[in-house]
Amino acid sequence: MAIDGYLWMVILGFIIAFILAFSVGANDVANSFGTAVGSGVVTLRQACILASIFETTGSVLLGAKVGETIRKGIIDVNLYNETVETLMAGEVSAMVGSAVWQLIASFLRLPISGTHCIVGSTIGFSLVAIGTQGVQWMELVKIVASWFISPLLSGFMSGVLFILIRIFILKKEDPVPNGLRALPVFYAATIAINVFSIMYTGAPVLGLVLPIWAIALISFGVALLFALFVWLFVCPWMRRKIAGKLQKEAALSRVSDESLSKIQEVESPVFKELPGAKANDDSTVPLTGSAGEPSGTSEGTSVGNHPRASYGRALSMTHGSAKSPVSNGTFGFDGHTRSDGHVYHTVHKDSGLYKDLLHRIHSDRGPEERPAQENNYRFLRRNNSYTCYTAAICGMPVHSTFKAADSSSAPEDSEKLVGDAVSYSKKRLRYDSYSSYCNAVAEAEIEADEGGVEMKLASELTDPDQPRDDPAEEEKEEKDTAEVHLLFHFLQVLTACFGSFAHGGNDVSNAIGPLVALWLIYEQGAVLQEAVTPVWLLFYGGVGICTGLWVWGRRVIQTMGKDLTPITPSSGFTIELASAFTVVIASNVGLPVSTTHCKVGSVVAVGWIRSRKAVDWRLFRNIFVAWFVTVPVAGLFSAAIMALLMYGILPYV
């Protein structure tokens, strides 16, 4: 059958297929490296580099099997024997419908399934072309069933693996020995699965025709050799690396403690750059003691009629402002004294130049080293009412172990910090404006953590009528120790690469499956598509996926790697290994499961095991709803394009 007149459709198909591959990379890339980026074991740039290598390799070696299912397993192509151009138009419509919806979802940061998109789009154009008889509904039922089976199976496998790791490694007093013993097993399992997948699924591409027992034997042998290599070389190197890291941290902590204990009470390097302040009588008052100042200067030193307040290790003025010699802005330093005797300072700066400097004020010293009367300082937060940084500075302990020196305070001192009555490890303060922090900054609790300091009014904490969380009942989120982080850091990189390899093999079919059908129809002039999937088309799809990853992949990575549940290297390793194992098995049997479903199932299962409160169930609900929406929406887009081609273009060409 002469179809040379439809070359324009093939060219259009190649362009749309690349856009479709781009959308697959932008959305589904989070399935392979989202958890690795979320746990911090790799940066976004490193993830893009590794994913580019393994996505492309996986697409070339594993993509042919699933691509055949996408091309011929959803609709009966024999019904198009007399209308080849209609099937070609349908393949173009399927790619357009899938690409449009995935690009919209990526823009909305919504992780959806590329498999869902292409299946829905294929059904959509078939309904327009020849009605319901063109759809193999039993195959569709199997595919829909796999959408539920894949997250459940992947979640179950991830959960079991994480429980075993937690029992035998994470919960041990010293997790390193058991972790090092398990390394060869983990690496061997990963290598065995990959080798088996390449030799079994990619055998036609590689020109290998081997029985299954031979493939299994070769895979086991390669895995055994790799396990010996890990045991002899990687484990000793990892042991030295962990020991060196722990020794370095201990040495730095010891040196820091010794250095801080030698700092003079009147000497504060933090303020050496700051000039003197102007008091109300225009007399110059230094913000900190200088080298020439007598070391015996007391905290109660006064200058003129203006008392000098203690400022951590430095002595500072409670009123005035000064022009900074190292910036173009004004460094305001205003004092507010309340009836409780505490001095509150507002620091204004119209640029972020002093952010780090002021951050050091409160962190220069631990509470166990300062007298009970000395001040402690808070982290800076962006003031919502001003384009400057506002810091509330007052005498306030950050740890519950730091007790007030005068336990027999007068009743009016209850206006001060709640002290012993609260835990400083949980509650935090929040202030949003200049006036609110001035009025309430002392009546709060504080916690310094990786995300900064939030603030909550102490009036809420001390009010007996207010409900309060019971720390004993609150489930604590498990966090990896330093040695566990190092141990699983390397493992998660490997499993992320494994996941990327599996993702490329499974999802490249979503991008170039219709393109392969379009090309084979044009080349052979028939709809049966008997030829093997060309390797160069698989590579073309892999390049498109990598392009989408580099340009737009970070949007959905945020959702999968951080928003759904916090990820640590140990949990990330479990998620990656179990979900990738599920995907590879499905790819080998030719079942187009969704890598999104597998990864989401693993993330939720492991997050729920770590802590039920660690999972964002609202986000999970939205993702679950999106799984159902994707098929009909992609089908509608595809049906619209198919109607346009059939009734608006094909009759006139």
UniProtKB/Swiss-Prot annotation:
On whether Isomerase is a keyword of this UniProt record, the answer is: no
Describe the reaction catalysed, as an equation: 2 Na(+)(out) + phosphate(out) = 2 Na(+)(in) + phosphate(in)
GO (cellular component) term, any one: apical plasma membrane
Bias kind Polar residues: ranges: 295-304
Q: Which residues are glycosylated?
A: N81
Q: Which residues lie on this side of the membrane: Cytoplasmic?
A: 27-46, 108-109, 164-190, 235-483, 553-572, 611-622
What ranges are annotated Extracellular (topological domains)?
1-5, 68-86, 131-142, 212-213, 505-531, 588-594, 644-653
Tell me the keywords, alphabetical order: Cell membrane, Glycoprotein, Host cell receptor for virus entry, Host-virus interaction, Ion transport, Membrane, Phosphate transport, Phosphoprotein, Receptor, Sodium, Sodium transport, Symport, Transmembrane, Transmembrane helix, Transport
- Name the source's superkingdom: Eukaryota
State one Pfam family annotation: PHO4
Q: How does it assemble?
A: Homodimer.
What does it do? Answer: Sodium-phosphate symporter which preferentially transports the monovalent form of phosphate with a stoichiometry of two sodium ions per phosphate ion. Plays a critical role in the determination of bone quality and strength by providing phosphate for bone mineralization. Required to maintain normal cerebrospinal fluid phosphate levels. Mediates phosphate-induced calcification of vascular smooth muscle cells (VCMCs) and can functionally compensate for loss of SLC20A1 in VCMCs.
Q: What is the official name of this protein in its record?
A: Sodium-dependent phosphate transporter 2
Q: Which organism is it from?
A: Felis catus (Cat)
